[in-house]
């Protein structure tokens, strides 16, 4: 299963692609989509959407996982962040991908084993789990963590579905 993890942001949206092969997690790619702060906000959202459509077309993931974000510095930031998440989710749905959402606490729990882990602990664990030579850029590292969370959670979700 190939998973595209997303760390949404109105200025920088991080993405990370991993492949689950048996019990192993394999790093495929990661990066960030940057938007121009000087451009109209609608055009920035369009850039996020188009950038993720390109990533999806190139890497053909089986699923998308997006981090839910609850904290923002102010109401305006929260609204912009929500809109960036929406652009990312629509890119996934537009490509026919199942989209799952995870809270930061769920991601930390899945990656580190502790829901209140520090950002550095999550980054170090992502580096270790994916056998990366160095810690990825912050937004991309967060996106890889979301992908790891989904890859590890998807198996459990399938088991629970089969029980019902």
UniProtKB/Swiss-Prot annotation:
GO molecular function, one term: crossover junction DNA endonuclease activity
Primary site of residence: cytoplasm
Catalytic residues of the enzyme: 7, 67, 139
E.C. code: 3.1.21.10
Annotated positions binding Mg(2+) 1: 7, 139
Subcellular location: Cytoplasm
Pfam families in the cross-refs: RuvC (PF02075)
Enzyme kind, highest EC tier: hydrolase
Cofactor stoichiometry and binding remark: Binds 2 Mg(2+) ion per subunit.
Membrane spanning residue stretches: none
Complex and partners: Homodimer which binds Holliday junction (HJ) DNA. The HJ becomes 2-fold symmetrical on binding to RuvC with unstacked arms; it has a different conformation from HJ DNA in complex with RuvA. In the full resolvosome a probable DNA-RuvA(4)-RuvB(12)-RuvC(2) complex forms which resolves the HJ.
Family assignment from sequence similarity: Belongs to the RuvC family.
Protein name (database record): Crossover junction endodeoxyribonuclease RuvC
Taxonomic lineage of the native organism: Bacteria, Pseudomonadati, Thermodesulfobacteriota, Desulfuromonadia, Geobacterales
Gene: ruvC
């Amino acid at each position: 299963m190939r998973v595209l993890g997303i760390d949404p942001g109105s200025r920088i949206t991080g993405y990370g692609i991993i492949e689950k092969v048996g019990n192993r997690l394999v790093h495929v790619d990661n990066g960030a989509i940057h938007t121009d702060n000087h451009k109209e906000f609608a055009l920035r959202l369009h850039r996020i959407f188009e950038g993720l459509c390109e990533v999806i077309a190139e890497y053909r993931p089986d699923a998308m996982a997006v981090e839910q974000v609850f904290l923002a510095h102010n109401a305006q930031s929260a609204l912009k962040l929500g809109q960036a998440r929406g652009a990312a989710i629509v890119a996934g749905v537009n490509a026919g991908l199942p989209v799952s959402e995870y809270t930061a606490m769920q991601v930390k729990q899945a990656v580190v084993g502790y829901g209140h882990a520090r950002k550095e602990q999550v980054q170090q664990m992502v580096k270790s789990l994916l056998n990366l030579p160095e810690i990825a850029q912050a937004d991309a590292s967060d996106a890889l963590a979301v992908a790891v969370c989904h890859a590890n959670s998807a198996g459990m979700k399938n088991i629970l579905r089969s029980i019902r």
